Swiss-Prot record:
Its cofactor is Mg(2+). GO terms for molecular function: isocitrate lyase activity. This is Isocitrate lyase. InterPro entries: Isocitrate_lyase (IPR006254), Pyrv/PenolPyrv_kinase-like_dom (IPR015813), Pyrv_kinase-like_dom_sf (IPR040442). Homotetramer. It is found in: Glyoxysome.
Amino acid sequence: TRGMLAYVEKIQREERKHGVDTLAHQKWSGANYYDRVLRTVQGGMTSTAAMGKGVTEE
């Protein structure tokens, strides 16, 4: 079996070619919204941000 490589070759590349939004799951999951809420509540600083340096969708 080729596992993840087979998924990338057969599914994910086609999704990327067609601009499928779910490839960037943090964009459609609301991560940016919740980060803004956390920053507002915590006075602009948070250590639990879902988006930012080091995330898979930089």
